[in-house]
Amino acid sequence: IALVGDAAHCIGESTKVIDAEGQLIAPGFLDGHIHIESSMMTPIEYAKAVIPHGTVGIYYDPHEVCNVLGLKGVDLMAEEAEKTPLKAMLTTPSCVPAVPGFEDSGAEITAADIASEMKHDYTVGLGEMMNFPGITSSAEPTHNIPGETLKAGKIITGHYSIPETGCGL
């Protein structure tokens, strides 16, 4: 809502006017962290399920799809998410596999891959950093991944500690 009252001076050729007199207006919900594929739905079906309940935007991290299909899977999800009415903001998976040597995956993400993915308009930042050993041991390949995100001027998301708890990641 930009203005309540007479807005005649703001109306132009491409302005969409919605007469909401007598109606209730509520803000939409923005989901700050979601893995669409965990719902066992495609982005289109996910949008159909959540929009009627007030979700209008999502920050999504398709790391499970990336574990299977690599960046091709991430890009396929992003292309489909753009076809929905949701404001879908991709956070590129940061850890594929989540912890190298701990699990098998169908792909591997490097800092060069992250640099490439950050060039997409639909990519707003980096998804959760799950490689706890790589971060705490200051492993250069692990640290280069968020570094590429910062070079691109984009955000880094994740599971962070609360200083008051004294806990780690």
Model-derived segments and spans:
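Short loop/edge segments at beta-strand edges and connector loops
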Residues: 5-6, 92, 160
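Divalent-metal coordination cores built from histidine and acidic residues
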Residues: 44-154
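Di-metal (Zn2+ and/or Mg2+/Mn2+) metal-binding site signature of metallo-dependent hydrolases
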Residues: 23-46
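Gly/Ser/Thr-rich helix-start
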Residues: 6, 23, 29, 55, ...
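Short acidic loop-to-helix transition motifs that present clustered carboxylates
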Residues: 161-166
